Amino acid sequence: MNIKFRLILMNFMQFFIWGAWLLTIGAYWFQNKGWSGAQFGAIFSTMGISAIFMPALTGIIADRFINAEKLYGILHILGALTLSSLPLVKDPTTFFWVILLNMIFYMPTLSLSITVAYAALKGSNKDVVIDYPPIRIWGTIGFIAALWVVSLSHNETSVNQFYIASAVALALGIYSFTLPKCPPLLSKVSNKSFVNLLGLNAFALFKIPKFAIFFAFSLLLGAALQLTNAYGDTFIHDFKNVPAYQDLIAVKYPAIIMSISQVSETLFILAIPFFLRKFGIKYVMLFSMLAWVLRFGLFAFSNPAGGLWMIILSCIVYGMAFDFFNISGSLFVETQTTPEIRGSAQGLFMMMVNGFGALFGSFTSGVIIDKFFTMADHTKNWQGIWLCFAAYALVIAIIFPFVFRYKHNAALEHAIQHA
């Protein structure tokens, strides 16, 4: 079977698992179980908590003790078991712990999938810059497909969403053992010091200025991603409280409107190779930050009637905001680290974006919104909220090019292919 097709299948299932429940778990929580909103807030914190330590830890394990594709498969099989047990849970506290356990198994597979894909492409003499983005696009397609499968089968409030995700996780776990081997590379290194053995040498990247700065901005951009995930859908839902808007299609079906963001992801992924070759990694990252400014700024002045075009354009811009940093960031890590620590380094990248970034964004935005943008009647000043978020992204975009000193060079493609 063609290696590209095999990696496409891997990416499709990787994100199908997440898409099968991530956007519909709220409907299950409130409409099926009738549990409280305060308790539900803790559910999304499990992603940040698990992303802080698990990707880096499993990256170290993959670099030192076990083939990355085997570890990837084991984690998905364990994730399938936890997902299939969720329908048995009868109280929100236990539900939190089971979801946390599932996230502990799932979050590291995001970085491991990159490690496995890059190794397989290089082993087949493929160019990562050219060949990986069209493969990764199928992950987003998988996410969208899962959302539509669950919705069209009327399982948005049903336990079946977890069974669907579990079945695909089990299939991916088994399939992973057939992927090209990605063995630990420490065995090729003669210096097996205590630091190398535990994988702590990957953390030494923080001593290198360009990496310290890169990881800091990874955290800040991770916070921006959390802001849009947490408040985008809620923002549109709140228009139902305005009589003039409550019967509009965008208000009745906000998830359909927001799904434009995922479609945009698939299109911007295809543009990444061109932008990387034309502008280099540094400016592609900068374009991502400017896109976040537009994402939030357009929301600030939009509405579901005459301003619907702004909501749609904001969703389109999201593709650039999300893809241009996440994909170019993983390529930066890939090209600037030695083979022995790449798995650990990819884990650190995911830890900063989905771990500390998610927690930072969730906590600070909650405090700011409650303190400055929540009215006495508990309604929210959404324009103020989005302008605040846009200002945050703008400050990041202004500072970044002055402190991140990384120059694009013509040898980038060669370094990626032969590193």
Regions found by a protein language model. Name each.
Residues 1, 179-216, 241-246:
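Juxtamembrane intracellular "pre-TM" segments in multi-pass secondary transporters
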Residues 1-48, 211-246, 253, 326:
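Helix-loop boundary and gating motifs at the non-cytosolic
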Residues 6, 85-89, 169-181, 385-419:
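Multi-pass alpha-helical transporter architecture, strongest
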Residues 12, 82, 92-112, 116, ...:
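Hydrophobic core of transmembrane alpha-helices in multi-pass small-molecule transporters
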Residues 63-76, 277-289:
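Cytoplasmic membrane-interface "Motif A"-like loop-to-helix N-cap segments
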Residues 77-91, 290-304:
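C-terminal ends and interior cores of transmembrane alpha-helices
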Residues 100-138:
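Cytoplasmic helix-loop-helix junction between adjacent transmembrane helices
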Residues 152-168, 367-393:
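A membrane-interface helix-boundary motif in multi-pass transporters
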